[in-house]
Amino acid sequence: MSENLSDNYTAINSDNDITANANNNVSDSSNNTASAGNNIADGSNNTASAGNNIADSSNNTASTPTVGINMESETSNKTPIKKEPKYKFETLDIIMLPVVFILAFLCIKYYNLNTGMVTLGLGATLYIVLYVISVLAYAKLKAVKFNSESIILSVLMILLAISFTVFYNYSLNIFMQIAMNFMLIYLPVTVFNKLIKSETSALILYDYINALVFIPIHNATSFWICMFSKRGKSTSSTKTKYFLHIFLGLLIGTPFIMIVIFLLSSADATFKNIFDHLFNFDINVPENIGTLIWSLPMATYLYALIYGSSIEDNSKSFNIDKFNKTMDNAVFIPRLSLYTVNAVICCFYILFIGIQAIYFIDILGGSLPADFTYSEYARRGFFELLAVALINIVFIAVAKIFSVKNENNKYLRIHIILNSILTLALISVDFAKMYLYISTYGLTTLRIIPSVFMIFLCFVFAFIIIGEFKKSFPVTKLSFYAGNILFVLLCLANIDAVVARYNLNAYMNGNLPYYDIYNLRESDMAAMPVIYKAWKNSSDKELKDKLHFCAEGIMGYYSFDIDEPISYNYSRNKAFEIKKHMNLN
């Protein structure tokens, strides 16, 4: 009888009382046997065998397994568990590598934190449109079903991107970039249905932070692992492998190619003209090398965001049930306390609205309160009322989140509805003030922007009121998209030209007695077509001189604007053409 045991061969002879074990030390005073790697002293006629029970006609064999041998045998019989890879790249994910790198280059070159309206133009539009198309195509090829939000958001982004090329919204520049930056981050998680509640909700802030920080960090290495990881034929085809090698070659060789082109352009005028005039290349080796270098971390981030959004499971990092339970445990404000505060505040609102109504009736009748002017009345308290409206939104949110849940909900709804209605009344007072201000002193962008914001607040409080009657009404979602739609429409309205046209026409018709035409100098280049048209058609020499002076002031202030083809902007280009026609300095 023979048996293999942990690299030892044990031979057992059943006719004798002696068992010999290979590689074991035996100490025996009678007829004893020591088993596999152990010293056993025994005074009887027993045989100890490692891991085996042997019965014999004359002797009893006791089996005494040792811990070390059991562990070794058990380990040797186990099949190693293969660790599941963190990333499972498909052919489509590999193809996205050069696409994302191109997007990163365009972002760094034509749309970055240092880019203002002086350089925002065709390049920024190209980057944003390609970004939207790339994300949508990537999702479509991954068999993702688009929801209505992803379509609406994509359309809004493209429209806002077009405004970068068509209009010169200098006064909206900062707001446009803030809105676009938010949507650029928010788009992938919307398209790939990775929002916490599968749609824009009250958790929009967490959804944005998740897209901005958590998903890119969790997938920070995906760009490089996808680029350099070894793949078998089962994971990538030969064509994909060649495609990746070509991309790597271009990525590594681009700086050297640019240096060669620069040197050849310097050596031959004809060669230089080919790139200068045919392709409009602006060869700046240090700048473009720096752009390529900065494009790598940007590509790493964008790929982590887009690819991570396609695979990330939000349930691992955010549990909605746990969140709701935490919020239930966090409530501590008795509703009676909220009712008391809201009742007192509403009383003050009613008193304030009554006083303003009396003032407004007097103003419509042609009389002003003592020691008041139109401008003082219109300006006084305008932004304070906007702040009050925002405070009311915060109050309503706190009331709904932190109030005790097991109390009667009926009275809370009544208080929220009352607060919202009075806030709408306060906004109406603000509208009345703004109307008086504009009709007396004309339009400015700083009067249009708050007016549009007030319209947005009207939508918000109207949605809040509806939400109190219909529990499933998506207040946050509709407010978010109402705000975005209003803002995009504002950007497409070319408000700087609208302001100049309204003021100039009203001034020439005698409807703005307090307006100073020299205020046109504060306009931007979007106002140049309006000024040029009035200058060209007017026969009043004094008016023409004033308009010429205003146009010189505008173009003198914006004379530093660049004129690159990739930074083309229709309004800016039109303004420079008008500058030539008006012979401006």
Description of each model-found segment:
Residues 418-467:
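Membrane-embedded alpha-helical segments of integral membrane proteins
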Residues 520-585:
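Extracytosolic and intramembrane catalytic regions of membrane-associated proteins
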Residues 2-3, 67-136:
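N-terminal signal-anchor module of multipass membrane proteins
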Residues 113, 125-272, 295-313:
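Transmembrane-helix bundle segments that line or gate the permeation/cavity pathway
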Residues 279-293, 370-387, 443-453:
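Short aromatic-rich membrane-water interface segments that cap or initiate transmembrane helices
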Residues 488-513:
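Hydrophobic alpha-helical transmembrane segments in integral membrane proteins
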Residues 262-276, 353-368, 428-436, 499:
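Membrane-helix interface motif
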Residues 342, 346, 473-496:
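Internal/C-terminal transmembrane anchor helices
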